[in-house]
Amino acid sequence: MKRFLYLIILSSCMITGCICMLASCKNGNSYNNGKKDLDPNKPTVTVTIEPFRYFVEQIAGDDVNVNVMVPAGSSPETYEPTPQQMVDLSQSGFYFKVGQIGFEKTWMKKLQQNAPDMKVIDTSAGIRMLKTQSGNIDPHTWMSIKSADIITSNIAEALMDKYPE
């Protein structure tokens, strides 16, 4: 009887695990949150992380396409862009970077070489950077309301300069 109960519990755990694994699989291109069809008539901008997509979309609405380099759920410290992302990046007019995260420190030179006409905007310009207890700069600038205000101002200014309509 105990062995039968053990097998039922073990089977249930295995089935639940398989269901969870399958549910976590994604369709579409994760770097653009599944938005496959970008409007070719709209300018395209690229951001490093999802919170910055939100900022751009709140400022520009549907007037620009927004690509995200580090997909939701990926680590911005260790993520490596896909070849397709590098191709798509060349269509961006702007790259709105966070300023101090690992992905940008590692990849920014290569991203700029790949898209030499793309203008890189450091959205942390004007933000007083905080240091962690270990003395490193805290890259999570968007978490502060004051800093988010500066970030969105930097984004809005760049977009208005290039796309005044």
Model region roles, listed by residue range:
Residues 20-165:
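Extracytoplasmic metal-acquisition and chelation regions
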